[in-house]
């Protein structure tokens, strides 16, 4: 990760490249040291926990590895929860309407598979709960309501 970013170079006058983060702390959530650093920083400044985006596209997941690593590593002892980013991935930010990954909610079988995947996180002592119930959020409530 760091090597790729440090290959940047000054392109025009006033253009400051490469930008090296403080203490070489590149943002790489697959790196345990990054997660430990973020956890320590959060605790130092009184942040209770993190809410991670969760991507589930009819059984296909994206960016799930960091949370799976957290689940397996008790040293990353910071409360967390999920926000289900339940919207199609598209290229709207480029001005195009191209859908890269459509959001599809599926039938009862797909919902059960999704639940079965999430329940291991909900049962983790670090997962944020209120009155013993796991908390979370939906990115796009209307889409869920319209689909059901």
Q: Can you name each region flagged by the protein language model?
A:
Residues 1-148:
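Glycan-processing catalytic domains of CAZymes
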